Amino acid sequence: GSTIKPLLAMAGLKEHVVDEHTKILAEGAIQVQSEVDPSVYYTFRDWKVHGWSDIRKAIADSVDIFFYALGGGYGDIHGLGVDNMEKYLKLARADQPTGIDLPGEASGFVPSRAWKRETKHDAWYIGDSYNLSIGQGDLTVTPLWLNMYISAVANGGKLMKPGLVEN
């Protein structure tokens, strides 16, 4: 879930969707008009009211509303969109085995607009982008990949291949 927020924060900074001064008022929920039926509104909730949040607070306090805007767009924030979120998750190898020296390693899965159309016979909606932006929905990653990715965040960006040691 929320463990992918630092990755998407970096993507948002790189793509100039947000900068270190961008602030979003996170009052507990946002409402978005349906893309199919304009008389319907969907509510996307946060786990608490956070108030004004910049990217640092959004990562530190896991501010879902900031990441809804960062990923799917809201208000004045254009959003990364599904294609950019997919791009950065795949650049971080979220959909690939880590290469650890163990047989049968599983891969994660990064959903895309094309995958949803082909598999679920449905369009990609803003709610899908919101779910992806907080690490939910159809995204799956392995615990080992999470360790590898967070290690890269901690060590300045070097993605290390995990391995086993004797003892």
What is the predicted function of each stretch?
Residues 1-2, 7-167:
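Beta-lactam-recognizing serine transpeptidase/beta-lactamase-like catalytic domain environment
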